[in-house]
UniProtKB/Swiss-Prot annotation:
HAMAP family: Exonuc_7_S. Belongs to the XseB family. It comes from Clostridium beijerinckii (strain ATCC 51743 / NCIMB 8052) (Clostridium acetobutylicum). Coiled coil: none annotated. It holds the Pfam family Exonuc_VII_S. The gene is xseB. It is found in: Cytoplasm. It is an enzyme of class 3 (hydrolase). The lineage of its organism: Bacteria, Bacillati, Bacillota, Clostridia, Eubacteriales. Keywords: Cytoplasm, Exonuclease, Hydrolase, Nuclease. This is Exodeoxyribonuclease 7 small subunit.
Amino acid sequence: MAKKESYEEMLTKLQDILSNLETDDLNLEESMKSYEEGVKLVNKIYKILDSYEAKISIIKDDKELEFSEDYGDK
């Protein structure tokens, strides 16, 4: 089973792809493959960030509820 790439690994890979695309050393076919791989990585990265954003929102809402129960109007 393949190891799941971390956010940091994907971000580094995306930065490498962007650097390669900016050098103009790739032919058209290589550029398209790199571009497609980059788009896939961006989508994976956004999914990870969306997941963490949802978790933060839940934690924040729980803490606000806890705070209002502890210190709210009685």
